[in-house]
UniProtKB/Swiss-Prot annotation:
Glycans are attached at residues 131, 189, 219, 232, 241, 314. Residues 15-25 have a biased composition (Basic and acidic residues). This is Phospholipid-transporting ATPase accessory subunit CDC50. The chain crosses the membrane at residues 49-69, 360-380. It is found in: Cell membrane. It comes from Chaetomium thermophilum (strain DSM 1495 / CBS 144.50 / IMI 039719) (Thermochaetoides thermophila). Pfam families: CDC50.
Length: 407
């Protein structure tokens, strides 16, 4: 007689009468990763490991901090604040600039070309702009370079207390308009360019480029430095030519294009009046933003209220020690927001212009790691050495514990 099969038993002897092929389809695969059987390692923080880690961190941070500090001190620079030039400097006669307006970092000292003995004066003359002349005020600054500066020589302008990171200011532009598209008036009016969207004179023309950022562009102009006297040379009145080409990041030009607007559709921003007194004309057309690197640098908004922006540079020729003169057309009013402005002539290191703070921060962190390292060495190996895993330190082995005993 054949054995009786249990009720509900399958052909494979399973209790539910189903084969492996009938298993639920949402069952995770039987792998170490999916079934959480991966091998694991847990770091045990032994005294030797802690001391080793802090020693390595201290060496890295102190070494890197010392290197950054050294690089910062190899940079040579001269910074002159010319905010008060038009109001304080005499007209047509040079006067010494107050020393608190000058900051210099040079390794050489030369009484003949002392960087803190800069001079300034103001002058006024007519300037030809397109098809008309305009009366402009200039600040002329004479400054000294006590040692030869090797290229690249960079010329920055510096603004203080100007908040480009304000929420409304940051968004005040139209990206499509900057790319060259002829964006219609309604779109501009509804965009974040408000309130700089249309001609304030009521003509209905579109402001190009619209927005607060473009309207507030830094519009002081600087000439290339003119060498008046060079050490060990009889040459005089020799220009040290600088260029505004190559001062912006290469990728920025992809964000801009030549405008598709016709001249009768657009007007310049209100603060551009000195450059476009009679608006955009055939002989004074709107700028080609794709090639205007000064504009591109200005549109790269600064995160802090005090910032530098590159204006011009010289990549090829050294700037010899001597006396130089620079002419500044001062148009950008910083007094309305209690700010300051200056220009900076500087060399560059591997890490860029002079900035001592990264090196200081690394040295501070490295110093903290070193102090902790010394503390752990003294604590674990000199003051109170103890054996790891000693059962006598367990709470129930302490004499004060109930039923405890000393081992």
């Amino acid at each position: 007689m054949a054995p009786r099969r249990r009720r509900g038993a399958g052909q494979d002897g399973s209790d539910d009468g189903r084969s492996d092929s009938d298993a639920p389809k949402n069952r995770p695969p039987n792998t170490a990763f999916r079934q959480q059987r991966m091998r694991a390692w847990q770091c045990v923080l032994t005294p030797k490991l802690i001391v080793t880690v802090f020693s390595i961190l201290a060496a890295i941070y102190l070494g890197f901090g010392a290197w950054l500090t050294y690089l910062a001190h190899t940079v040579r620079d001269l910074k002159i604040d010319y905010t008060d030039c038009l109001t304080s400097a005499p007209k047509d006669d040079f006067e010494t600039i107050p020393q608190n307006h000058i900051t210099a970092h040079f390794s050489a000292k030369d009484s003949t070309f002392d960087p803190y003995k800069a001079q300034w004066k103001t002058t006024e003359r007519e300037v030809q702009v397109a098809n008309y002349t305009d009366n402009r005020q200039f600040c002329i600054v004479r400054f000294n370079i006590p040692e030869d500066l090797q290229p690249t020589i960079s010329f920055f302008y510096y603004l203080e207390n100007f908040y480009q990171n304000h929420r409304r200011y940051v968004n005040s532009f139209n990206a499509k308009q900057l790319l060259g598209d002829a964006v219609d008036g309604k779109t501009i009016n509804d965009s974040t360019c408000d309130p700089i969207t249309h001609d304030p004179k009521g003509t209905g023309k579109i402001v190009y480029p619209c927005g607060l950022v473009a309207n507030s562009i830094f519009n002081d102009t600087f000439s290339s430095p003119l060498a008046l006297a060079v050490r060990n040379s009889s040459d005089s009145s020799r220009p040290y030519n600088m260029t505004t080409k190559g001062i912006a990041w290469p990728g920025l030009k992809d964000l801009y294009g030549k405008t598709s607007y016709s001249l009768d559709q657009i007007v310049p921003p209100p603060n551009w009046e000195r450059r476009y007194k009679y608006g955009y004309q055939e002989n004074n057309p709107p700028p080609d933003l794709k090639t205007d690197e000064l504009f591109q640098n200005w549109m790269m908004l600064a995160a802090a209220p005090n910032f530098y922006k590159l204006y011009q540079k010289n990549d090829t020729h050294p700037m010899l020690a001597g006396q130089y003169e620079i002419e500044i057309e001062s148009n950008f009013d910083v007094t309305v927001y209690k700010g300051r402005k200056a220009f900076v002539i500087t060399t560059l290191s591997t890490m860029g212009s002079r900035n001592i703070w990264p090196g200081i921060i690394f040295l501070i962190v490295g110093g903290i790691c070193l102090v902790l390292d010394i503390y752990f060495i003294l604590s674990f190996f000199i003051w109170r050495p103890r054996k790891l895993g000693d059962p006598s330190y367990l709470s129930w082995n302490q004499p004060s514990a109930p039923g405890g005993h000393s081992s």
